[in-house]
Amino acid sequence: MATTTTPRLKTKYREEIAGKLREEFSYENVMQIPGLVKIVVNMGVGDAARDSKLIEGAIRDLTTITGQKPAVTKARKSIAQFKLREGQPIGAHVTLRGDRMWEFLDRTLSLALPRIRDFRGLSPKQFDGRGNYTFGLTEQVMFHEIDQDKIDRTRGMDITVVTTATNDAEGRALLRHLGFPFKEA
């Protein structure tokens, strides 16, 4: 367990959000209420094909941000145009579940996203049709765990929030209640 106390966002979900969602969609069963399954944070490092030391920086940044050691993503097949060989490391990803997932989501929503310059909100169109939401961040500096003086280069990342929602409307409602700042369409 990452912490001894229940994460703030998890408590809010159990006490407030679950009830609101049950009323909003009039679910018969408690198990129908959408919830979070996992959060996958992916950092693609295409330049690592030319310089293998770049992957170490991505691993260090992801470990610092998520508190978990990332898995290295390797190329599945060789592509000559990209100077890529099969099995070469080209990225890193972390799958967060349980309390670590709730803590990471809380830090992302309350600390990291407000630190983005000219932030107007997340696009409400990036749902996949099954209630899961993916968004990208252009740099890792917005997380306060990263020391700005120690970064070797800016790296973006993709964050996928996997939910138990069956469609986009349920997923959007869940994430809005959790505090995702969606742009008004």
From Swiss-Prot:
Q: Does the keyword Transcription regulation apply?
A: no
- Give UniProt keywords alphabetically: Ribonucleoprotein, Ribosomal protein, RNA-binding, rRNA-binding, tRNA-binding
Tell me one GO biological process term: translation
Q: Does the keyword Protein biosynthesis apply?
A: no
Q: Name one GO molecular function term.
A: structural constituent of ribosome
Gene Ontology CC terms, in alphabetical order: cytosolic large ribosomal subunit
Superkingdom of this protein's organism: Bacteria
Looking up PROSITE patterns in the UniProt record yields: RIBOSOMAL_L5 (PS00358)
Q: Which Pfam families match?
A: Ribosomal_L5 (PF00281), Ribosomal_L5_C (PF00673)
Query: Record's NCBIfam families?
Result: PRK00010.1 (NF000585)
* Subunit relationships: Part of the 50S ribosomal subunit; part of the 5S rRNA/L5/L18/L25 subcomplex. Contacts the 5S rRNA and the P site tRNA. Forms a bridge to the 30S subunit in the 70S ribosome.
Q: Give the family per the record.
A: Belongs to the universal ribosomal protein uL5 family.
Tell me, in a sentence or two, what this protein's role is.
This is one of the proteins that bind and probably mediate the attachment of the 5S RNA into the large ribosomal subunit, where it forms part of the central protuberance. In the 70S ribosome it contacts protein S13 of the 30S subunit (bridge B1b), connecting the 2 subunits; this bridge is implicated in subunit movement. Contacts the P site tRNA; the 5S rRNA and some of its associated proteins might help stabilize positioning of ribosome-bound tRNAs.
Q: Identify this protein by name.
A: Large ribosomal subunit protein uL5
Species name for this entry? Streptomyces coelicolor (strain ATCC BAA-471 / A3(2) / M145)
- Upper taxonomic classification of the species? Bacteria, Bacillati, Actinomycetota, Actinomycetes, Kitasatosporales
Q: Its encoding gene is what?
A: rplE
